[in-house]
């Protein structure tokens, strides 16, 4: 008798004769897609083809979507951390640190490994998987801590022969079973050398991950392909693909098996060729079967369009050859031009091989602050500066606010949005990546990177709010106090305003398109993850089918072993395809999606720069000129009056007013010239983003070809293995 009502036994995957008569409170009937052949026939279906049973609930067009959504939310909250043994929490942290991990959650590959190494039948594995992993929502991407707790509890119940229902889990809340899994044992053995000296100190959340790989997202997406075999085994491994990219070497590690034997995954056959001018290096083999490196942290390094140029000047703003573009916008040249120099709309850009600075941002697991006023901290690390500081999200907001006041006519990067009570793993990961893009765009900007506020933000080790109280901070407009050079205005091209309007129009349209592209690619990646989960369901269902094949064809069982071998081969290759799909979706999120978001942020920041120009670049020169004319007439009139008819000091007062107005006109005119020069320089900086577009398209196309080849190899291998299945001929 359950606290939430009786829960009749489920129709077994092959060994139970009870029939489910009603739904439990938690709507935890497993989807038959992952159950055995005998599961769907005993659910009280009135249809000949069982088209009103659990299969219907797995349809996205079904009216039971609300029921499935409620179950999905229930799995997350059924077993909070306070109700589970320490071994559950340790197991989750262990898998996050040593196993497959997607963002800040446990990936489906690790879920499959835990199930397959638990000694359960394929039917029980399929039932548990379908209970814990819903067909929609974030669980198709991986399991959070609450879902993982339910997974372990269900495995423990199955090993003890108990019912596999949420009611059964709730009944055992006070004394949850301790599951056994050889996969978790292997992870513990692997972690043993680096175990902490004080085992009694158990982290409730994953420890801060190490510094991230300092590569752009396109390079990180290629790293997930680096260990898929040698260059000779990959006909698509062009050395040109990796020219100019720095790949991080990782320590080799034995690959993690997936429970179905040696299955070819998306990260055991990629290759990496060095550039023509580089020495070819040995491909690292420390990637897991899902494409992740050891201890892959929940962090990423700066990347995207800013990280792919490799042409920043040596900290002198826009001076030197960078400014020799946009007509005659830059400093005077030597009078000689390269014959092959490209010029579009009068823009010419020279490049440099200087390596750009990269900043990593890690989300720290512990919250700080009083109850109801807690906040999360981020570890901001700069390898070039050798600094590591702790910052809050509000610190980033303060920095951007100061930069907007001081540099309103610069290409200021975008901050991810703030959301109240948003602690979901997906939102926190998106915000962290947005902070990575923001910080790296700052340090790669020729002017903003030299700003004292930015330097202090990245290097002051104390809490920023404390430093702000002690420091003298200036947020004056960058043009305040500057003297207009005599030749600057003449050096600007006459059609500069027309170029500004042309670029602004193109940027506005491009930004809208890239916003839509990011949304579409996120949707494609989610579909790939959902497709991977369904492939795993299909694989588990086929395995459970082999358990009843002998009984189904009991009249003559001679061909059953060969039949089961073919079915298991299909299950193995479906599992392999699931790994490939999951790896590809992850590569999209870390690679092409981040590249598109960098390009989107770049375009939106330029669009906002033009919007700020409309608001802040105004002047009142026409009004001042009219007032000067009026005061000059008044001054002439005063001077023509008799000496006693003029009040003392009135003439001096009018003269001072005229002088101040003329001085204001000169200052406002100079400021207008500075604004034009500033925006011109920003467009020269922005011009480099076109080359990032080329790289992201090249990288993504190569990635798609490689994964397509791997999928083709996988299904070709399956075709060979099922060739010998009995045909009754």
UniProtKB/Swiss-Prot annotation:
> What InterPro entries has UniProt attached to this entry?
AH/BAR_dom_sf, PX_dom, PX_dom_sf, SNX8/Mvp1, SNX8/Mvp1_PX, Snx8_BAR_dom
Where is this protein primarily located?
Answer: cytoplasm
Q: Which domain of life is it from?
A: Eukaryota
- Annotated residues for binding of a 1,2-diacyl-sn-glycero-3-phospho-(1D-myo-inositol-3-phosphate): 392, 394, 418, 431
Question: Which GO molecular function annotations are given, in alphabetical order?
Answer: phosphatidylinositol-3-phosphate binding
Which part of the chain is the PX domain? 356-464
Q: Where in the cell is it found?
A: Cytoplasm; Membrane
**CDD domains attached to this UniProt entry:** BAR_SNX8 (cd07597), PX_SNX8_Mvp1p_like (cd06866)
What's its membrane topology?
Peripheral membrane protein
What ranges does the record give for the region Disordered, renumbered to this chain? 1-43, 177-340
Gene Ontology cellular-component annotations: cytosol; endosome; membrane
Please quote what the entry notes about the protein's domains: The PX domain binds phosphatidylinositol 3-phosphate which is necessary for peripheral membrane localization.
Q: What does this protein do?
A: Required for vacuolar protein sorting.
Q: What does the similarity note say?
A: Belongs to the sorting nexin family.
What protein name is recorded for this chain? Sorting nexin mvp1
Which organism is this entry from? Aspergillus fumigatus (strain ATCC MYA-4609 / CBS 101355 / FGSC A1100 / Af293) (Neosartorya fumigata)
Lineage of the species this protein comes from: Eukaryota, Fungi, Dikarya, Ascomycota, Pezizomycotina
Q: Which gene encodes it?
A: mvp1
């Amino acid at each position: 008798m359950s606290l939430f009502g009786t829960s009749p036994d489920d129709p077994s995957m092959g060994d139970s004769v009870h029939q489910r008569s009603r739904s439990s409170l938690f709507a935890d009937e497993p989807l038959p897609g992952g159950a055995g052949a005998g599961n769907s026939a005993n659910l009280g279906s009135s249809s000949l083809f069982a088209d009103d049973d659990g299969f219907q609930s797995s349809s996205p067009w079904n009216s039971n979507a609300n029921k499935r959504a409620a179950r999905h939310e229930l799995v997350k909250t059924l077993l909070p951390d306070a109700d589970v043994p320490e071994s559950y929490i340790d197991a989750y942290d262990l898998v996050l640190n040593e196993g497959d991990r997607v963002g800040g959650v446990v990936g489906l590959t690790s879920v499959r490994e835990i199930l397959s190494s638990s000694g359960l039948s394929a039917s029980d594995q399929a039932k548990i998987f379908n209970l814990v992993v819903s067909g929609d929502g974030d669980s198709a991407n991986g399991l959070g801590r609450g879902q993982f707790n339910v997974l372990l509890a269900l495995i423990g119940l199955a090993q003890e022969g108990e019912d596999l229902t949420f009611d059964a889990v709730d009944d055992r809340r006070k004394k949850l079973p301790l599951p056994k899994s050889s996969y978790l044992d292997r992870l513990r053995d692997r972690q043993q050398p680096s175990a902490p000296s004080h085992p009694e100190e158990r982290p409730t959340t994953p420890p801060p991950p190490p510094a991230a790989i300092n590569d752009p997202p396109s390079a990180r997406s290629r790293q997930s392909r680096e260990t898929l075999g040698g260059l000779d085994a990959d006909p698509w491994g062009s050395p040109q693909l990796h020219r100019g990219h720095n790949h991080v070497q990782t320590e080799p590690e034995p690959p993690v098996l997936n429970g179905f034997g040696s299955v070819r995954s998306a990260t055991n056959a990629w290759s990496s060729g060095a550039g023509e001018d580089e020495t070819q290096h040995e491909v690292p083999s420390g990637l897991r079967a899902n494409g992740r490196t050891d201890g892959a942290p929940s962090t990423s390094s700066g990347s995207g369009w800013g990280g792919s140029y490799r042409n920043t000047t040596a900290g002198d703003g826009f001076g030197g050859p960078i400014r020799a573009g946009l007509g005659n916008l830059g400093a005077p040249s030597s009078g000689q031009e390269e014959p092959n120099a490209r010029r579009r709309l009068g823009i010419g850009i020279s490049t440099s091989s200087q390596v750009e600075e990269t900043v990593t941002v890690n989300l720290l697991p512990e919250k700080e602050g009083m109850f109801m006023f807690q906040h999360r901290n981020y570890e901001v690390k700069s390898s070039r500066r050798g600094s590591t500081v702790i910052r809050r999200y509000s610190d980033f907001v303060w920095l951007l606010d100061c930069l907007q006041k001081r540099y309103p006519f610069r290409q200021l990067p975008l901050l991810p949005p703030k959301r109240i009570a948003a602690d979901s793993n997906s939102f926190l990961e998106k915000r962290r990546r947005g902070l990575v893009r923001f910080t790296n765009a700052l340090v790669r900007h020729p002017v903003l990177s030299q700003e004292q506020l930015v330097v202090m933000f990245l290097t002051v080790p104390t809490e920023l709010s404390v430093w702000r109280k002690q420091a003298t901070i200036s947020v004056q407009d960058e043009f305040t106090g500057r003297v207009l050079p005599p030749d600057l205005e003449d050096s600007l091209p006459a059609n500069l305003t027309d170029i500004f309007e042309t670029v602004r129009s193109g940027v506005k349209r491009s930004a809208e398109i890239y916003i839509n592209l990011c949304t579409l690619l996120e949707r494609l990646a989610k579909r790939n993850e959902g497709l991977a989960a369904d492939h795993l369901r299909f694989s588990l269902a086929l395995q459970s089918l082999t358990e009843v094949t002998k009984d189904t064809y009991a009249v003559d069982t001679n061909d059953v072993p060969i039949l089961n071998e073919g079915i298991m081969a299909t299950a193995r290759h479906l599992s392999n395809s699931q790994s490939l799909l999951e790896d590809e979706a992850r590569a999209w999120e870390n690679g092409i999606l981040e590249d598109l978001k960098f390009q989107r942020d770049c375009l939106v920041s330029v669009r906002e720069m033009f919007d700020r120009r409309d608001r802040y670049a105004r002047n009142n020169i026409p009004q001042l000129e009219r007032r000067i004319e009026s005061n000059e007439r008044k001054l002439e009139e005063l001077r023509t009056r008799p000496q006693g008819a003029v009040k003392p000091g009135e003439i001096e007062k009018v003269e001072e007013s005229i002088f101040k107005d003329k001085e204001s006109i000169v200052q406002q005119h100079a400021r207008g010239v500075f604004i034009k020069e500033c925006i011109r320089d920003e467009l020269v900086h922005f011009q480099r983003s076109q080359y990032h577009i080329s790289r992201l398209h090249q990288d993504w196309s190569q990635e798609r070809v490689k994964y397509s080849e791997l999928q083709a190899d996988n299904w070709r291998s399956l075709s060979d293995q099922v060739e010998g299945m009995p045909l009754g001929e």
